[in-house]
Amino acid sequence: MAEGLVLKGTMRAHTDMVTAIATPIDNADIIVSASRDKSIILWKLTKDDKAYGVAQRRLTGHSHFVEDVVLSSDGQFALSGSWDGELRLWDLAAGVSTRRFVGHTKDVLSVAFSLDNRQIVSASRDRTIKLWNTLGECKYTISEGGEGHRDWVSCVRFSPNTLQPTIVSASWDKTVKVWNLSNCKLRSTLAGHTGYVSTVAVSPDGSLCASGGKDGVVLLWDLAEGKKLYSLEANSVIHALCFSPNRYWLCAATEHGIKIWDLESKSIVEDLKVDLKAEAEKADNSGPAATKRKVIYCTSLNWSADGSTLFSGYTDGVIRVWGIGRY
């Protein structure tokens, strides 16, 4: 019996591209999503046939596209980054923004929480990486001069490795950089991509890092050594990457579908494509009419903490939910 993924349902409330999805680490029945409709939505997962989740709260305040959103480990707060140049911290229970982080001079493209939630990192089109405390004070800026990136910083993530606290960043300068969190000094520059790098993901144990972007190739790196291990061909622009929390799988959101690799065999386990016709027949069209685009593709994705469910956000504003099944 092979394991595969089947479409479990859809979640409709965003009116533009879904840019990011955050899932709680305790596997609670909520997720949070960010969109180019300038809002963040807190969803309650109902797991119904028609709608897998319902919008519980819409968080508004950003004045431009919201590009990224992450959850605190206790699930109480969401952190977002926007093209308005700001980060915001949101109290999910109250549905309000409790803090604004001002300092970037251009669009914020990526945000992340450290493991203990006491530190925040952000990446921007101003070519900097900023480290903040939760009070909204910028503690350190890694700038373009010296060791910093030479172009937009598109993605930034903390490694879950507590022994070697690390920040990983990806950039339009075609590199991935690995930084020591303790002093914000460069540990290694990972070069190998031939086009801009739009996304980076760190494996659950903190040993591996995967990067992808314009060249359609996923590169896997040994984080401790700063060495390239191998590459996987997606043959299409890559918008997002994530590791499964409990299988040796890597998922890529590409312009030609969601590709899932088994990293042991380096083979594709699944290539998920959307059947819009079948979806239209199943839906009762009660949700808001998303912008009509002929070609849609996945722009964001994240696993549930138990690895049973893959949430994927698309250019048409719909979140499609895939579940592990056997066939």
From Swiss-Prot:
PROSITE patterns from the UniProt entry: WD_REPEATS_1, WD_REPEATS_2, WD_REPEATS_REGION
GO terms of biological process kind: cellular response to abscisic acid stimulus; gibberellin mediated signaling pathway; positive regulation of signal transduction; regulation of translation; response to gibberellin; response to glucose; ribosome biogenesis; seed germination
An annotated Gene Ontology molecular function: MAP-kinase scaffold activity
Top-rank lineage group of the source organism: Eukaryota
Tissue: Widely expressed.
Extent of the WD repeats: 13-44, 61-91, 103-133, 148-180, 192-222, 233-262, 293-323
InterPro entries documented for this protein: G-protein_beta_WD-40_rep (IPR020472), RACK1-like (IPR045223), WD40/YVTN_repeat-like_dom_sf (IPR015943), WD40_repeat_CS (IPR019775), WD40_repeat_dom_sf (IPR036322), WD40_rpt (IPR001680)
Record keywords: Cytoplasm, Nucleus, Repeat, Ribonucleoprotein, Ribosomal protein, Transducer, WD repeat
One term under GO cellular component: chloroplast
Subcellular localization(s) per the UniProt record: Cytoplasm; Nucleus
Disruption phenotype: Shorter hypocotyls in etiolated seedlings, epinastic cotyledons, reduced rosette leaf production by half and late flowering under short-day conditions. Reduced sensitivity to gibberellin and brassinosteroid in seed germination, hypersensitivity to abscisic acid in seed germination and early seedling development, and hyposensitivity to auxin in adventitious and lateral root formation. Plants show a significant resistance to water stress conditions by limiting water loss through the guard cells.
Job description of the protein: Major component of the RACK1 regulatory proteins that play a role in multiple signal transduction pathways. Involved in multiple hormone responses and developmental processes. MAPK cascade scaffolding protein involved in the protease IV and ArgC signaling pathway but not the flg22 pathway.
Subunit structure: Homodimer and heterodimer with RACK1B or RACK1C. Interacts with NUDT7. Interacts with GB1, MEKK1, MKK4, MKK5, MPK3 and MPK6, but not with GPA1 or MPK4. Interacts with OFUT20.
Assigned protein family: Belongs to the WD repeat G protein beta family. Ribosomal protein RACK1 subfamily.
Name listed for the protein in its UniProt record: Small ribosomal subunit protein RACK1z
Organism, as annotated: Arabidopsis thaliana (Mouse-ear cress)
